[in-house]
Structures are given as structure tokens and as C-alpha cells.
Curated annotation (Swiss-Prot):
It is a multi-pass membrane protein. Disulfide bonds: none annotated. It comes from Homo sapiens. The chain crosses the membrane at residues 64-84, 101-121, 131-151. This is CKLF-like MARVEL transmembrane domain-containing protein 3. Coiled coil: none annotated.
Length: 182
């Protein structure tokens, strides 16, 4: 730091050891946990953000630069959901319907990537546009896989909720019915 400290540390560190200090998390607290990054959802979000960034760079370098907004927005949204899932914000902010927001993000991204990739490959002839289209098709597949998995999870959750409601309804009907009315 400037200005330099006029009084240096009076007791230097021992030659072979290191001074134990408090664990300062710093910026490491913002990094996702390794367990989350190794999970299927973490890998999908990493692939989505990586492919979106590569597609964005390809569109910036191509003559199809009119399409660069969609990959940029999808990159930022994928980073946001990666951060939100890694920091477990969905548990902290339960007022938001996280699975539905993630599902809609993936569906719209898959459709938009598919449309602009077809247009970039068919209409433009430079190599960067073709590369952006190919990476866009890969991103379409990754986003479609993600929304398929989210849809299956939501469908399982809703089936469990329906079966619990049905058993509760049957129990209340049995309790309210008069068995002596034969």
C-alpha cells in the first residue's frame, strides 16, 4: 500500500512455517461449490453459459451482428441462474417460482437460438456466421435438454401433489360417509 509502512513487522515469520491466519473467504464465497458444478444442473448451466458466450463472440465477429443480442442476454441469464442455483437463492426467495422461470428461460432460448441459427447459416456466407450458427444449434440442444429435464421434474412434483390431494380427499370422504346407511 502507499505510502509504505515506516515500521515493518517486528517479528518475521519462521523460516519453515507459515503464520496461521483467519480464513478470509473474499471472492471465493461468490464461486459456486464444486458439488453443484459437478451436478447435472450445474453442468447444463455451465454449458449454456459457455455456448452462449462463444455464440455471442462469433456473432460480434460476423456480418450477422444483428443477432448478437440474443446470445448476450442468454449468456447473462444463464450466469444469473448459475449464480442463483449455486448460492441457493431459490431456497431463500421462495416467493418466486424458480422452476417456471428457468423453464421459460430454456424454452425461449432454445426457440430463439434455433431460429437465428437457421437464419445465420442460410442467409450469411462468412465463416463467423456459419460458426455462430453451428454453436447456436449446439446451444439449442443444450437448452432443449435442460427444459426437458425441468419439465420432467415439475411433472413428477405435480403428480406427487395430486396423489397426496387424492388420498386426502378419499380419507375425508370415508370419514364423512355414514357406514350404517346400508
Amino acid at each position: 500500500m502507499w505510502p509504505p509502512d515506516p515500521d515493518p513487522d517486528p517479528d518475521p515469520e519462521p523460516a519453515g512455517g507459515s503464520r496461521p491466519g483467519p480464513a478470509v473467504p473474499g471472492l471465493r464465497a461468490l464461486l459456486p461449490a464444486r458439488a453443484f458444478l459437478c451436478s447435472l444442473k450445474g453442468r447444463l448451466l455451465l454449458a449454456e453459459s459457455g455456448l452462449s458466450f462463444i455464440t455471442f463472440i462469433c456473432y460480434v465477429a460476423s456480418s450477422a451482428s444483428a443477432f448478437l443480442t440474443a446470445p448476450l442476454l442468454e449468456f447473462l441469464l444463464a450466469l444469473y441462474f448459475l449464480f442463483a442455483d449455486a448460492m441457493q437463492l431459490n431456497d431463500k426467495w421462495q416467493g418466486l417460482c424458480w422452476p417456471m422461470m428457468d423453464f421459460l428461460r430454456c424454452v425461449t432460448a432454445a426457440l430463439i437460438y434455433f431460429a437465428i441459427s437457421i437464419t445465420a447459416i442460410a442467409k450469411y456466407s462468412d465463416g463467423a456466421s456459419k460458426a455462430a450458427g453451428v454453436f447456436g444449434f449446439f446451444a439449442t440442444i443444450v437448452f432443449a435438454t435442460d427444459f426437458y429435464l425441468i419439465f420432467n421434474d415439475v411433472a413428477k412434483f405435480l403428480k406427487q401433489g395430486d396423489s397426496a390431494d387424492e388420498t386426502t380427499a378419499h380419507k375425508t370422504e370415508e370419514e364423512n360417509s355414514d357406514s350404517d346407511s346400508d
